[in-house]
Amino acid sequence: YGSASRKNTKPQAQIGLGCIYDVMNRMILESDCNKVKFDEMRLAEKQLERIPETIGNIPFIIIMDRGYPSTPAFIHMMDKGIKFIVRLKSSDYKKEQSSLSENDQLVKIKLDKSRIRHYEGTIDGERMKELGEISLRMIKIPLENESLEVLATNLSEIEFSTNEIKELYHMRWGIMPISA
């Protein structure tokens, strides 16, 4: 909405929209408008807090694209019992991704000083120190262009198979028309 531009530059939007979209029922459950530059994960965490007000205690799985995940976000969701599937960037948990020996594997992520440093002196940093490690299920999915995408989840193999996780994640692409 709205735009601001300088001479000889492309117009830029002046607000940013963050929303949680129900891919099964094709409806927005939570949304917020913000200034253009905002912390999407912090906003998502606030929206996740409000989901029970919107849908009651119906179980749900949050599906997020690259750019959202962070160790504190994963811990926050796991502490709240929120199930998630998140696409990782190749730079997220790089050591763990490169050492995956299977396409679907439970991985222990050590929360060492290098991972905590950025959060030092915060509640997130203290929680990371307290836990010492987290476990995430990492799933490698081959893409048509012969590259790999890696998903991280706290859903067990008993709850969802590798193929079901892949199908659930790709349902996320149905929201792209609303974000264009």
Region locations from a protein language model:
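Single, function-defining residue in the core of a domain
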Residues: 9-180
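Active-site- or DNA-interface-adjacent structural scaffold in DNA-acting proteins
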Residues: 1-2
